[in-house]
Amino acid sequence: MRLSMLLVCVVLLGVAQLRLSQASRLELSTAPNLPARVYLFKDNKPFRLGPVDSILPIKVDLFYRDTLWQAVANPKTLEVLAYDQSHVLLLDGAATFELPPGKYRVEATRGLFYEPTSESFELKAGETTKVALRMKRWTEPGQEWISGDDHIHLPRTEANNAVYLKWLQAEDLSVGNFLQLQRQMDAAPQYAVGAAGEAKATGYSIRSGQESRSEPYGHIVMLGGRALVRPLSVGTMYANEPAAYPFPSILFGLGKATGAMTGFAHFHGSMAHSTLPMDLALGNLDFLEVFQFGKLWTAEWYELLNAGFRVTGVAGSDFPVPLGRSLPYPKWLPLLGPERTLVKGKAGASAYDSWAAGVKRGEVVLSNGPVVELKIEGGVAKATGAFFRPMESLRIVRNGKVVATVKGDGTRRKLEAEVAVVPGESAWFAAHGLAKKEEGEPDIQAHTNPVYALVDGRPVRVREAREAYASRWAAEVEYYRGAKLPFANDRQRTEFFAACERALGVLRQ
């Protein structure tokens, strides 16, 4: 019996050694050495890299329970698996893989500011092949940007921080706002909030925040606060009992008391009805998500700017939701921060603090690829737009209307436009650039936040836009009065409708 067992072991060992002798080793790296996201193709078909040190299987559902699994203490690789598509991150810029012999191609991307790169090679049985991917930054020398995604849903423990920070580096995303929310129970929970929950590496931060949701009022976001504001959600759709209180204005006040930046998600909150006009009128908002899922809400954004509301437009992914919106996922787009909130400058000790300061100032560019900038000097508004692919157009917008357009010629990677600032009337200006897109990609574009040219400090106020907002809010108030909102008592109801009327009074001024 022992002899037969020994013979079996010898045979199995021989088979294993034969398999190892037939395998090929790939030593993959980037040059210069930078974390990056990579894709492998064998005979021009997607092929999984392996083995990997850590894996994040994504199942996009309503509860955000996606858990990071690590095989070793300090992973060099992370595989994100979603919708049968494999995305591998070189967390240290280099890793070794065991693969069958054959002809391969590997592609690498890193955020928005590096050109995609690829290398073709052949692996032979029993041999080691070294492949270096040349990473080239396309932005102008000396330009520094702090990039942020205001809307990521991933559960996070303190033990996850090292991998997730390197993931941010592989996507060249300076700031990831990880938002806790609620669906029955807490979803995408964070181990801590405020400074205690901030994970930092040089130039990068992960900061906890929250998304609070309600069916009658919409989805709102609070970033960077020292404490969670509860309840995270109200009403039976997201929580566990009928409720209409607290409404967003109350939550925003509580959030600001913790030092949080406050804003609406999905532009108007993603529900059929929204208190966005009320919260704009009452000055509760620092930002609005205006760029998400490849869509830039330009018409709606321009209208509220014309109505006199100075609020910063930001970009956020709502990760992991975008992974299923376009299949296969476009390799050019980062997984985290496919649309980004860019603040010009260099990150300080906390990348989040530097980024948040820029958002509060309104000095923000929104992009999923190009860089556009606009400045006003000498009575002229001047815009530039650049990308590593050809730029298709660059426009200057004044108070919601296009006042200058420059078209690309199919080859130019940088465009410039300018227009005179008409004296005597307050106005806001912005630049919007479009670049060439590949099959399966959304529009590749960038948009500045408004730059103001005010006369004697008078705000921009376009009568038609202001009246439209007032009318829209009046209609919403009538809806709410007839909706039988489940307030717990008359005090809550009175408080809500008093706020509604205050906002209506402001909008009608």
What are these regions (language model features)?
Residues 4-15:
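Bacterial N-terminal signal peptides
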Residues 6, 23-26, 343, 369:
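Serine/proline-rich low-complexity intrinsically disordered segments, especially terminal tails, linkers
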Residues 144-313, 317-325, 351-352:
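Catalytic cores of extracellular degradative/oxidative enzymes
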Residues 17-23, 29, 34-218, 223-228, ...:
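Long luminal/extracellular ectodomains of secretory-pathway precursor proteins
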